């Protein structure tokens, strides 16, 4: 908040941080931002980047407040091609109310006999991903997604615990919040190791497992 001023467009917490696998505390941020806005007279909103957590939290932690139940959360984005269970590339952004979507972000055109309004940087594109998401919503429903995500979390927890037992490695956190976790090589082990995480990445790739290393 110390970096916010009259030119700040929004604050962007992340649910499912790529570098940690954890979630930012959006509820605490919303509370602090409310006090900040009252004090300064600003109306700085929150956009939640829920690329990973957006398809996890509603099903596995529905009581956690990170969404439109919070005062200053006005928009949320998530990836359909991650835990939304759709092939790449599909992303979603939703607003709390139409009034929060600036007119400057959308454009309308009369196309094939009808007025079409959209928000996007490109025009002609396939609808296959959207149809795939619609199919998954209809086929799985809330309970289906809940079952899939629960299973994903169980597998993640197992891998997290087992990798944590391996001598070369240490987990970034002692718990998992998404089907995503980070581990790294112990500094003392790395000093004498004849291989790196990039070597491990290459070996896993040979077995068909795409695991990023940084």
Region annotations inferred by a language model:
Residues 1-45:
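Active-site phosphate-binding strand-loop segment of PLP-dependent enzymes
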Residues 14-17, 59-62, 66-177, 184-189:
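Active-site C-terminal subdomain of aminotransferase-like
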Residues 23-40, 53-75:
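Active-site pre-lysine segment of PLP-dependent enzymes
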Residues 24-27, 147, 195:
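Generic recognition of short, well-ordered alpha-helical segments
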Residues 32-35, 158, 162-166, 199-209:
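Generic non-transmembrane alpha-helical segments
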Residues 49:
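Glycine-centered flexible beta-alpha turn that most often forms the glycine-rich phosphate-binding loop
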Residues 145-149, 153, 197-198, 203-207:
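Transmembrane helix-loop boundary segments of multi-pass membrane transporters
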Residues 179-193, 201, 205-214:
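Conserved PLP-binding active-site segment of the aspartate aminotransferase-like
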């Amino acid at each position: 908040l110390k970096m916010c001023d009259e030119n700040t467009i929004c604050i962007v917490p992340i649910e499912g941080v790529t570098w940690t696998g954890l979630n930012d505390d959006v509820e605490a941020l919303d509370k602090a931002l409310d006090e900040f806005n009252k004090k300064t007279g600003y109306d700085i909103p929150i956009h939640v980047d829920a690329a990973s957590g957006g398809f996890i939290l509603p099903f596995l932690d529905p009581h956690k407040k990170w969404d439109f139940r919070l005062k200053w959360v006005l928009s949320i984005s998530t990836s359909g091609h991650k835990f939304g269970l759709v092939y790449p590339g599909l992303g979603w952004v939703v607003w709390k109310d139409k009034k929060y979507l600036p007119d400057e972000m959308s454009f309308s055109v009369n196309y094939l006999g009808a007025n079409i309004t959209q928000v996007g940087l490109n025009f002609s594109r396939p609808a296959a991903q959207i149809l795939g998401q619609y199919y998954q919503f209809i086929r799985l429903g809330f309970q289906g997604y809940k079952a899939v995500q629960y299973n994903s979390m169980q597998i993640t927890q197992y891998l997290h615990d087992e990798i944590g037992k391996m001598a070369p490695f240490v987990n970034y956190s002692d718990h998992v919040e998404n089907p995503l976790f980070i581990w790294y090589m112990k500094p003392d082990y790395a000093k004498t190791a004849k291989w790196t995480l990039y070597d491990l990445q290459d070996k896993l790739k040979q077995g068909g497992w795409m695991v990023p290393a940084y």
